[in-house]
Amino acid sequence: MKKDVRILLVGEPRVGKTSLIMSLVSEEFPEEVPPRAEEITIPADVTPERVPTHIVDYSEAEQSDEQLHQEISQANVICIVYAVNNKHSIDKVTSRWIPLINERTDKDSRLPLILVGNKSDLVEYSSMETILPIMNQYTEIETCVECSAKNLKNISELFYYAQKAVLHPTGPLYCPEEKEMKPACIKALTRIFKISDQDNDGTLNDAELNFFQRICFNTPLAPQALEDVKNVVRKHISDGVADSGLTLKGFLFLHTLFIQRGRHETTWTVLRRFGYDDDLDLTPEYLFPLLKIPPDCTTELNHHAYLFLQSTFDKHDLDRDCALSPDELKDLFKVFPYIPWGPDVNNTVCTNERGWITYQGFLSQWTLTTYLDVQRCLEYLGYLGYSILTEQESQASAVTVTRDKKIDLQKKQTQRNVFRCNVIGVKNCGKSGVLQALLGRNLMRQKKIREDHKSYYAINTVYVYGQEKYLLLHDISESEFLTEAEIICDVVCLVYDVSNPKSFEYCARIFKQHFMDSRIPCLIVAAKSDLHEVKQEYSISPTDFCRKHKMPPPQAFTCNTADAPSKDIFVKLTTMAMYPHVTQADLKSSTFWLRASFGATVFAVLGFAMYKALLKQR
């Protein structure tokens, strides 16, 4: 909504433009009227819309054509004043003023016009019969007001309508020729309906309508008022109400009715509450609220955000199979201007045997987006109506900014829940196998993945000491030197192929170049351990290398298994990320890993039991 309103009054000489302004300000008819009133500013606190309003007079005797053109270009709304007792001034509305204004304004964003019939005190008839054809001919005319500066009749109403034409314009909402709402308005209201339909049954029930009424207008509707609204819809269209709920068709009809009856401020209140600007686009302020992220801090979703996402998943999981089918996912994204997830997402998070994103996979993808691109996450939550449905100031309330990692190292504990692991190794050493194994996929399932659907990321939950954490794996492409972005992480997984004698040398070189003197813990993984192991062409063996650099011994790993691959290395990687201060002696201790793994096993079993219990409730 505009921050202020600039109203320009034009018209033939002596129709009463200046008198109208002076009568508004002094609340009495002036005995002496100057040729032109000075610009007047009405403060926000005395206007109905709480917006500062500037009223500008035009005098043909005192101002040039150039000055008039400048005033037109600066105005938000123009009042064309005529005298109801002067036919010449009425004729000039169409022969001079409307063409002049339209010549000076962009065709795609015509200025709203108000026709003002002054001096109604001098006649006993109305000029409306003459004016109505003009209003029908020019769609930029918002309304016509007959008034009297002498009797103070409709003076405040005139300026209220002018304000309203700027702050709540009809143009973006409604096409008078077609007598229906414009496509952009229908699209915006359809999104609002889908967000408000919290059980996704295609209708707004009484509870949903009451919530909608409260968040938009700060007041609930009485039961009888709700019934009256539905009766109005029933009276006009047959399929506007179903099962005592308002359908999308009924919802759109109501707003069409508001606009046709001059109540378009009601529709604008709804649109603006859901983040729309005057062009019916979602505002940057709504989609991208301010969120300060200091250096060495990461971004995670908080508990309230996960609850919201859980309810979003449940809303669209219509068959209750704990996975979103392509159609269910498409339905979820109908409130987005585009489909945000590509086929690579299905290979980034957990899916069921049909390749559909599971409940856990859904939450994981949101966790990944928040961590890697928090602005994109805020945008997506905005499309879903997070701040509205949770009654928060903005989507920023869904995000936790973690403390500086240096503080974690000093205090020897972390509050983070998401840990990034960069997976490094030569091409074809088995990195993608490690990523897919995190999602529980063995080699047979991995072979079904199309090349163009592959992902360089994988994310899933891992239990360490009974705590659920997210492990985010990032496959780093092979290169001679790593960039700073490729080095920054919580833990490094250096992968080599036991069957390729040239594979380990790269891991050793990268470790020495970038990680030997850093505080980032590293784990070496001996991939494809089901194959015949060959001697690595390096000065010392991988085992001796680990011993020399006080690292845990190489971890044998294969995804060529009948069932899901072992998750041991993921528990170890997450543990190392959580406790980077732990000594290498502890990391090599079997008791240390046993405690971590035992906690993971117990909580995985408990988690599965709770998951089944939730399923039964659903």
UniProtKB/Swiss-Prot annotation:
It is an enzyme of class 3 (hydrolase). Residues 2-168, 416-579 form the Miro domain. GTP 1 binds at residues 14, 16-19, 59, 118-119, 121, 149-150. There is a cross-link at residues 153, 235, 572 (Glycyl lysine isopeptide (Lys-Gly) (interchain with G-Cter in ubiquitin)). Residues 184-219, 304-339 form the EF-hand domain. PROSITE patterns: EF_HAND_1, EF_HAND_2, MIRO. Pfam families: EF_assoc_1 (PF08355), EF_assoc_2 (PF08356), Ras (PF00071). Changing residue 156 to A: No effect on PINK1-PRKN-mediated degradation. GDP binds at residues 428-433, 447, 454, 477-478, 528, 530, 558-560. Keywords: Acetylation, Calcium, GTP-binding, Hydrolase, Isopeptide bond, Membrane, Metal-binding, Mitochondrion, Mitochondrion outer membrane, Nucleotide-binding, Repeat, Transmembrane, Transmembrane helix, Ubl conjugation. Changing residue 18 to N: Causes constitutive inactivation. GTP 2 binds at residues 428-433, 447, 528, 530, 558-559. GO terms for molecular function: calcium ion binding; GTP binding; GTPase activity. Mg(2+) 1 binds at residues 18, 35, 57. Ubiquitously expressed. Expressed at high level in heart and skeletal muscle. It catalyses: GTP + H2O = GDP + phosphate + H(+); ATP + H2O = ADP + phosphate + H(+); UTP + H2O = UDP + phosphate + H(+). Atypical mitochondrial nucleoside-triphosphatase (NTPase) involved in mitochondrial trafficking. Probably involved in control of anterograde transport of mitochondria and their subcellular distribution. Promotes mitochondrial fission during high calcium conditions. Can hydrolyze GTP, ATP and UTP. Belongs to the mitochondrial Rho GTPase family. This is Mitochondrial Rho GTPase 1. It comes from Homo sapiens.
